[in-house]
């Protein structure tokens, strides 16, 4: 009897560790699978052309990314340098504009995978807890915006290795330089990424305000903010865009952004699962999570097959706000867990230890089931989006290569996007439809597809004219149509 207790305790602790390890492996595996799927889906279905991506891709093809738009958003230089500029250089060297667009899509959608690889390499925490949270964040947040080429995708990808480097880079000149480069890259991904930069420095505060790593990060932050302000002053946006950017900034944190079908579905799934689990845990405590998950899968199946008529498309743009708001929360939890495991906290954090112990003892399986339910929602909604995008792109191609015409739009070679079936127009992005129509027609459209109610115009007449007259790899026909369109409005 004297040995039974310790042996039983050992088996119990082993079981707890095993369940926690399974949850960890599930999160890591799912995050990595998503990061690979982003690249595969984007390239197979040409998602680099969706929404603003059509304009960015066209700018790459005609080798004018900076002149077309990026000089207006100088605070997002990281995206320009890491994806658009290399693609534009490739077009210049290869003479193949279509291949250049593929290079842009590849580099942009590789960011989540590259971010996870960088985080794994930089993370020195016990159990690589920062890397685990990075995978969790990638799996739960990135599918919300996947497909829309928001610069916050890159910001999210850079945040995690930047967090790991800030906590674990050696206090040497080389280590400080690495922290500076990572925080600078993050800050110049998007204006919203400044929130993530501040968050990283804040996660170091629990080490103590006199801790060398905190002081290093704070000093680097001051330098990064100074550089960001200097660039904004030196390279201001055009007058046309200044007002547009100001209005966009004012609505960035509007709570109405989250009142969309995908967010409601995710919260309803969690709430439904949680409620069913609590009820069944009294009847079958060991398998309540399985039964609750099975019931929710059945409910979701009924919803998707018979009740659902939504497409998570345009809201992918607005949900970039979720990355700004939720990513720092995941980052803070990761940093606290890492510092607790390394015993680097300046003060005891008993509630954190108790929460982690509770997760290991009782919540690993229920959390795993909840995680997979959310993943199921993301998988289905992503599949619906990709399928609808494929049909919409085909419809635009038909118009761009056809003979239908709407001269009232300003030219006999213009055709209205309203000719597209209404159920497909949910994938439309009115300001970039003309650029999409040129690309899908292999840069030689017989018609320029235009949204007649569009009120946002990317190019001025002068910019479009200069590009048309320049020597470019793209045939002049498509560039001429866009020049006419631009000169009619700007």
What are the language-model segments listed below?
Residues 370-489:
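Membrane-embedded, lumen/periplasm-facing catalytic core of multi-pass transferases
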Residues 265-269, 311-350:
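Hydrophobic/aromatic-rich transmembrane helices and adjacent perimembrane loops
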Residues 37-112, 142-152, 184-321, 385-395:
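Transmembrane catalytic cores of multi-pass membrane glycosyltransferases
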Residues 106-131:
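Transmembrane-helix motifs of polytopic, lipid-linked glycan transferases
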């Amino acid at each position: 009897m004297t040995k039974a207790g310790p042996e039983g305790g050992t088996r119990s602790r082993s079981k707890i560790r095993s369940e926690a390890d399974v949850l960890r492996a599930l999160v890591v595996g799912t995050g990595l699978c998503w990061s690979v799927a982003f690249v595969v889906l984007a390239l197979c279905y040409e998602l680099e052309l969706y929404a603003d991506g059509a304009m960015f891709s066209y700018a790459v093809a005609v080798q004018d990314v900076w002149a077309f738009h990026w000089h207006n958003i100088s605070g997002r230089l990281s995206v320009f340098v890491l994806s658009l500029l290399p693609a534009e250089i490739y077009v210049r060297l290869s003479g193949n504009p279509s291949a250049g667009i593929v290079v842009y899509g590849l580099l942009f959608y590789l960011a989540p995978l590259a971010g996870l690889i960088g985080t794994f390499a930089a993370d020195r925490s016990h159990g690589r807890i920062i890397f685990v949270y990075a995978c969790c964040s990638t799996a739960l947040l990135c599918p919300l915006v996947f497909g829309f080429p928001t610069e916050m995708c890159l910001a999210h990808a850079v945040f995690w290795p930047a967090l790991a480097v800030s906590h674990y880079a050696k206090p040497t000149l080389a280590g400080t330089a690495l922290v500076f480069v990572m925080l600078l890259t993050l800050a110049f991904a998007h204006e919203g990424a400044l929130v993530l930069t501040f968050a990283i420095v804040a996660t170091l505060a629990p080490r103590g305000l006199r801790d060398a790593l905190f002081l290093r990060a704070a000093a680097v932050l001051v330098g990064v903010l100074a550089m960001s302000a200097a660039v904004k002053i030196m390279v201001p946006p055009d007058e046309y865009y200044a007002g547009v950017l100001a209005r966009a900034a004012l609505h960035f944190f509007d709570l109405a952004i989250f009142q969309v079908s995908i967010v409601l579905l995710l919260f309803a799934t969690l709430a439904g699962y949680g409620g069913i689990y609590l009820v069944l845990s009294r009847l079958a405590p060991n398998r309540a999570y399985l039964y609750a998950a099975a019931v929710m899968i059945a409910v979701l199946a009924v919803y998707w097959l018979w009740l659902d008529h939504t497409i998570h498309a345009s809201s992918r743009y607005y949900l970039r706000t979720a990355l700004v708001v939720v990513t720092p929360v995941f980052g803070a939890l990761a940093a606290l867990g890492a510092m607790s495991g390394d015993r680097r906290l300046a003060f005891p954090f008993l509630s954190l230890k108790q929460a982690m112990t509770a997760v290991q003892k009782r919540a690993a399986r229920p959390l795993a089931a909840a995680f997979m339910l959310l993943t199921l929602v993301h998988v289905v909604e992503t599949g619906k989006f990709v399928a609808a995008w494929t049909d919409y792109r085909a419809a635009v191609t038909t118009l761009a290569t056809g003979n239908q015409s709407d001269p009232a739009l300003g030219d006999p070679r213009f055709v209205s996007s309203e000719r597209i079936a209404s159920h497909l127009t949910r994938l439309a992005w009115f300001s970039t439809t003309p650029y999409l129509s040129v690309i899908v027609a292999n840069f030689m459209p017989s018609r320029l597809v235009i949204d007649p109610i569009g009120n946002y115009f990317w190019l001025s007449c002068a910019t479009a004219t200069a590009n048309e007259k320049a020597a470019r790899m793209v045939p002049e026909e498509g560039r001429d149509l866009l020049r006419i369109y631009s000169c009619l409005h700007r």
